[in-house]
Design a protein with these regions (language model features):
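...captures the hydrophobic TM-helix bundle architecture rather than a specific catalytic motif
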Residues: 1-169
Length: 169
């Protein structure tokens, strides 16, 4: 969106471009804000999974998750672990706070390698999409906390495609 800033004489003296879309600039404060906003959204989905896991554990006779879908509990533990570690804690602390507050504390005008920060901000939603696509594979990738490639070729009730997609994400 283009905005003109007018001087007191009515002449346009400056043309500025304001972008409210994906981060297409290398301003470290804006990139840090995108990190913090994305970690907030991923944290909400991780919190929903945490509440679902706790409700399942506290109800002894009544089950929240239907008994026909036994792998969904393991799948929710896998997704909860990935979301909380790799989509909430690491991008929030390293990307969000590291890009927003650390340069301000140090008095640095810019950060080193801002284009790499920009690229990693754009890769996070793609990675989240791959993690969600692993849900739609055959049985899902309900491996719990153990995510490693031999599980993708095992004869267990896991989806080999789902494990590969969640490792790639």
């Amino acid at each position: 969106r283009h905005t003109f800033i007018y001087s007191s004489l009515g002449k346009s003296c400056h043309l500025s471009y304001q972008s409210y879309t994906l981060p297409c600039n290398c301003n470290h404060k804006r990139i840090g804000l995108y990190y913090l906003l994305s970690t907030f959204l991923f944290g909400l989905s991780g919190t929903i999974l945490s509440v679902l896991i706790r409700l399942e554990l506290c109800s002894s006779g009544n089950r929240i998750i239907p008994p026909e879908n036994q792998n969904f509990y393991n799948l929710s533990i896998t997704l909860h672990g990935l979301l909380m570690i790799f989509f909430l804690v690491m991008p929030g602390l390293f990307g969000g706070l590291g890009n927003t507050f650390v340069p301000i504390y140090l008095g640095a005008p810019e950060v080193a390698y801002p284009r790499v920060n920009n690229m990693s901000v754009l890769v996070i939603p793609l990675s989240y999409t791959l993690v969600l696509l692993s849900l739609n594979s055959e049985f899902g990738s309900g491996t719990g906390w153990t995510l490693y490639p031999p599980l993708s070729t095992s004869l267990m009730s896991l989806s080999p495609v789902g494990v590969d997609v969640i490792i790639c994400g």
